[in-house]
C-alpha cells in the first residue's frame, strides 16, 4: 500500500469512533490501544511480541549517537500552489537533540534554512524574506516539513512500545511518545511510518537497510493536512562531524546545543 493511501486510510479511521483496527498484522492504523479499541486489537502471541521487541531493540542500538552530516537532494511538492521545488543541500543531525537543513538555490544562494530541536523550530526562505518560528504545537508547523526533521531525522524510533507483531519477514510496532502515537512497520529494507498527534497526521515511506546514515537511502514524507510532499535522497554521508554551531539557534549565535 502506498504512503498516500495509508495516510488517507488513517484519516478516515480517525473520524470513525468505532472503527476496528485492521486485522492484517502490518496494517496497524494509528489508534491508542485503550477502551473499546483495545477489545478490537488482534491478539499477539508471546513469540510474536518477543521477536518484534528484539527487532526494534536492534534497530535502536544501531542508531547513531554522534552528530553527522548528510548531503541530500530534495523535491518538495506543494498541492496548494501546484508547484514542485528541487534543490540540493545538507542536513546536520545531532541525534535526539537538533537538526539543521540548508538547501542551495541558483548561484549558490540559500534557498531554504530549517533549524529544529525537540521543542523549537525556525523555518526560513531568505529569497522572499519568509521566516516562521514555532514550538511543539503541531499547528505551528502545518504545511511545513518540520515533522520530517523533528521526527524522522532526529528520533524515528523514540517512544514507549505499546504493541508489536511479527512474522518471519516483517514486524510492526505502535510507539507512544508524549502526546504522539507512531505506527511503524518494516521488513528491514522498507519502513512505512505514520505519526499522529491530536488531529495532525504525517507519514513517511523510507527505503534503506536499517535506519542508519547511508548513501542511497531515500524516501517520501507526506504532511497530512495540506498534502505537502517531500522526496528525499541521501547522496553522501560525510566522514567528519558538523561544527557544533550548526545546531545553534540561527537568531541567537553562540547557543549551540
Where are these regions (language model features)?
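Hydrophobic lipid-interacting interfaces of membrane-associated proteins
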Residues: 33-35, 73-79, 106-109, 119, ...
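N-terminal leader/targeting segments and the immediate start of mature chains
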Residues: 17-86, 94, 237, 244-257
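Extracytoplasmic segments of membrane-associated envelope/inner-membrane machinery
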Residues: 132-166, 173-176, 184
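Bacterial N-terminal signal peptides that target proteins for export
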Residues: 1-6
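Gly/Pro-enriched, hydrophobic low-complexity segments
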Residues: 164-257
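An acidic-aromatic
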Residues: 94-151
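Beta-strand-dominated lipid-handling architectures at cellular/organellar boundaries
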Residues: 68-73, 82-90, 96, 115, ...
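C-terminal motif of bacterial Sec signal peptides marking the signal peptidase cleavage site
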Residues: 13-15
Amino acid at each position: 500500500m502506498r504512503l498516500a493511501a495509508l495516510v488517507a486510510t488513517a484519516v478516515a479511521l480517525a473520524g470513525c469512533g468505532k472503527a476496528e483496527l485492521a486485522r492484517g498484522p502490518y496494517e496497524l492504523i494509528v489508534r491508542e490501544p485503550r477502551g473499546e479499541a483495545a477489545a478490537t486489537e488482534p491478539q499477539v502471541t508471546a513469540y510474536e511480541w518477543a521477536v518484534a521487541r528484539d527487532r526494534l531493540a536492534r534497530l535502536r542500538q544501531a542508531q547513531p549517537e554522534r552528530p553527522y552530516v548528510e548531503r541530500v537532494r530534495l523535491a518538495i511538492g506543494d498541492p496548494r500552489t501546484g508547484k514542485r521545488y528541487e534543490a540540493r543541500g545538507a542536513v546536520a543531525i545531532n541525534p535526539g537533540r537538533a537538526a539543521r537543513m540548508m538547501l542551495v538555490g541558483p548561484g549558490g544562494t540559500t534557498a531554504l534554512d530549517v533549524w529544529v530541536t525537540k521543542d523549537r523550530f525556525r523555518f526560513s526562505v531568505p529569497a522572499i524574506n519568509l521566516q516562521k518560528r514555532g514550538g511543539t504545537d503541531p499547528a505551528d508547523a502545518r504545511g511545513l516539513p518540520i515533522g520530517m526533521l523533528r521526527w524522522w531525522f532526529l528520533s524515528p524510533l523514540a517512544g514507549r512500545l505499546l504493541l508489536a507483531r511479527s512474522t518471519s519477514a516483517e514486524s510492526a510496532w505502535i510507539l507512544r511518545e508524549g502526546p504522539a502515537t507512531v505506527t511503524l512497520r518494516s521488513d528491514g529494507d522498507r519502513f512505512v511510518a505514520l505519526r499522529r498527534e491530536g488531529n495532525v497526521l504525517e507519514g513517511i515511506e523510507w527505503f534503506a537497510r536499517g535506519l542508519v546514515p547511508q548513501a542511497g537511502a531515500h524516501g517520501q514524507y507526506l504532511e497530512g493536512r495540506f498534502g505537502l510532499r517531500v522526496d528525499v535522497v541521501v547522496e553522501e554521508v560525510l566522514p567528519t562531524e558538523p561544527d557544533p554551531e550548526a545546531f545553534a539557534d540561527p537568531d541567537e549565535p553562540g547557543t549551540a546545543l
